[in-house]
Amino acid sequence: ETLEVLEPVELETRGTLRDEVQLLRALALLALDRPDAAADTLAGWESKDGMAPFAHFNRAVALVRSGRPDEGLTLLDTVGRDPVTPAPLRDRANLAAGYSLLETREPDRAAERFGRIRLEGPYATQGLLGAGWAAADAGRLEAALGPWTRLTTQPAFDPAVQEALIALPYVYAQTL
């Protein structure tokens, strides 16, 4: 239904508004689990305005979800390193890249992405959790203790903190 509403709007608009409609269309396609179509929608993104990093991030997510992880990770890496990109979006791109790399059993590359996430940002706890999992997946259980122990100082209602609280006893038992 959302796509039907956006279709005539997209045809009649120009410039920034057209870019916004294009991004909304891609987000709707992602929500409908149509990542190939979402990636294609954002493939020709030419705008250089403030929306570009968001379009690139969402295209990267669509590429990863559509089975093209190498292309998606390359784009996530670009967004995650770009100083023009807003810091929270850089963190989110690095978080997405880190967890994608954990899924493909590349813990060392994942750890590098998690290490780029700011400790004072909105994705800090998820980044610390991921850093711990990257260390654990690489067989460095003692290295997982650092980020997970740091998480225990955060509010316990955070799911990343809860997961670390569950993982810590296992790691302690294995390393003693």
Briefly describe each language-model feature range.
Residues 1-176:
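Acidic, polar-rich low-complexity tracts and alpha-helical solenoid repeat scaffolds
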